[in-house]
Structure formats: structure tokens, C-alpha cells
Amino acid sequence: MAAKSLKSEQRKYVFLFLTPALLTTVAFTTIPALTTLSYAFFHWTGFQRKGFAGLDNFHRLFSFPFRDQFLTALRHNVLVFIGIFVVQTALGILLAYGLYHLKRGQRFFRTVTFLPVIFSLVVVGYMWQSFLDPYFGPVNHLLNNLGLDFLAKPWLGSSTTALPTMVFINLWRWVGFPAIIFLSGLNAISTEYLEAARIDGASEGQIFRKIMFPLLGPSMTIISILTFIGAFEWFDIPFVLGGVSGNPAGATDTLALMFYRLAFGTADSGANEIGVGSALGVIIFAIVGIGAAIGSNILRRREVEQ
């Protein structure tokens, strides 16, 4: 009886501590998601709901004039995911490996590596706009002084360089996060495996390739999931540096920016299209949800295998 009473008391405390998080999730995630889903199936005039639309809003999204915008934005999101995942993961592993082998000052360099992650987006945007200013920015000034003036260009003003530049800025800001995740994964590896490999004559490169890298699988999956979600919800940096229209000339447009334009309307895009915007929101949610579910399933399998 005493054991049952203790378990019952523990359940009460567990429920008590989980309640705030559950209420927050329901209020700020579940309810808005369900509301957006319902909006997608109605016609709208401004912010006034009209009759039931069925799948008409989805049909309009894949028809002129929204189809080309959608496909362009989707392509940009896919390119952003590929670029960020490949480069950020590689740099994150290299940084983590370097930090792992530091004998002194690891805490300091770990802090420096993670510092850009906590910077305000306003600060990041203003700083990089200043750095990349085509006339007064230090980047073009340095290139000109080095005799590389042919490389100097309006990095954020050219349709060929704007998106890669924003991806680079995103990498600079977030690379510290996967580095810390991978560092935690390296620290979790038993030193017995490493010492046994060294005794057998394995080099540090062989130890990394044969032992460390495979055991970073769960960390790699976590980073993959978070990168996928972040890439297909990418809004902040393009919005701050390119505006809601994905300037220049839509070269940095993303699904999230398109959703914003459709849901709220802009001076360039005209009046809002809540129904079509909500349909786009549902599609974004489905893409992110399916990607996250696949990644979570892979992560569970790797945990079972290990």
C-alpha cells in the first residue's frame, strides 16, 4: 500500500510539472495549427470569412499566379537545407573535434564558438549589412586593397549572390550549435574504446573514422532533423536582409516569406489571401512534420542498434 501511495504521489508531481509545458504547447502550437488548418478550407474577403471552399485554396496555390512563386520558394528552401546541412555539419564536426582535443581553454573556446547563436537577429542583420555594404563595407574594401576588385560586388543586392550570402550568414550564426552537440557526442564516447585502439596501433585519423564518427550517428540525426525544420521554416535572415518580398527580385524568397505575404498582404503583393496562405501553411507543416517523423524514426533505430 505504501509503495502504491508513493507512486500515486509521484504521478501527481509529474503531472504538476508537465502541466505548464502542455498548456503552453496547446496554446501556442496546437490551437494555431488547427486554426490555420480550418482557415485553409474557407473563402476569405480580407479578414472576413465567407463560405466553405473545400480544396479550392490548395488548387489556387498550385495555379497561376501563385504556382511559380511556390515552386521558386520551395526550390530555395531545398537549396538552403542542402547547403546548410552539408557545410554546417562538416564545420560542426571539425570544430567539435578540435575542441575535444584542446587541453587548455576548452571552456573559453566553447563559449566563443557558441556566442553567435545567442546574438540578437537585429544585431546580426545590421552587422552583416554593414560588412557587406557595396560602397563602404570592409569586405569589398579589403578585396579592392588586395587587388581582387573583380570579386567585389553587391553581395546582398545581386540575384546570383544574395541567397548564398544569406546561407553563409546563417552558417556563421548557427554553426556553434551543432559543434556543441557533436562535442557532447564525442565526450560521451567511452575512453576505453579509444585507448584500446591506440594500443592496437591505430592512428588518430583511423580512430576518428572507425570509432568516433560512427558513434556520432545519433547526434548527426538530431542535427539533420533540426536543420531540416529550420531550413523549411527559414524566415528571419531573409526577412531582415531581403525584406518580405525576398529581394532582390525574389532571389531569396522562401515558403515562410510567401506565407507571410499571403496571410497579411504587402504593398508589393497586394491584399491578403488568408485562404491560400493557410493552405501554404498546412503544406509547410506537412513537409516539416513528415521530415521530422522520418528523422525521429531513424534516430530511434540508431539508438536501438547502439
Locate the predicted segments by residue.
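A structural signal for multi-pass alpha-helical bundles of membrane permease subunits
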Residues: 4-306
